[in-house]
Amino acid sequence: MSATKKIFFASDFHLGMPNKDVSLEREKKIIDWLNHCTPQAEAIYLVGDIFDFWFEYQRSVPKGFVRFLGTLANITDQGIPIYLFPGNHDLWVSDYLVKECGVTLIREAHEFMVEGKRFYVHHGDGLGPGDFSYKILKKIFSARSARFLFQWIHPNLGIALAHKLSKKSRLAQNPKKDHYLGNQKEHLAQFVTQHLASVSPPGHKPDFYIFGHRHLVLDVQLDTARYLNLGEWLYGSQYAVFDGESLQLLQWPSQQPAKSQNQQSTINR
């Protein structure tokens, strides 16, 4: 990686939530952030739930987001890779964004090495012990048959229904009302601990686990690794940046360190 370049990570934009006007303001804020990243970006990782709902019908996609989609295309046209992970809200992302915006779609956990550091990146949904009801639902909705059946629902009805269900989601609530449950209760923290124990040889253990989904800004030291959660953009606007030496959680637009909600400050390793 070039000494002047950086890798950026963000998640949980939830574009489309809770209404057109509020979403548009958030979209413009995200575009400002992307334009800030572009001149110095080695790569940009968008780690799930970028859209509050997304479905690609045979001849149509959801209205809106044209500024955001155009910005993605402009960035990839410059040769800067954008890696997009589907989340639980936009798990039906398919090849439209690949063909029209040039993004690289990554559906599973992604591991990579940069400057001697190993990264493990995933949206975070369905990882760790428990949450069996969601894991079953994810398998059902991920099936081709589910997509096939949904496409026969008129878009006006299907998209409206999806947004209505989303507004009832616990994660649509203000994260200030939520809190970190501790390393022994948080599914993603448990996943990191279990994954670290399963990796052999030790030199293959990730240094950084980067997730979204939880809607909390987290920087947790677990054994030899750091677990970072990227926060959200519904009420906040946080992101992570790796400069080849250190990985930091920052707040946009101040670019100041984001306060970790597990009461642990950002640590450079």
What are these regions (language model features)?
Residues 124-191:
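Active-site-proximal loop/helix segment associated with metal-binding centers of metalloenzymes
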Residues 258-269:
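Short, basic, low-complexity termini and linkers enriched in Ser/Thr/Gly/Pro
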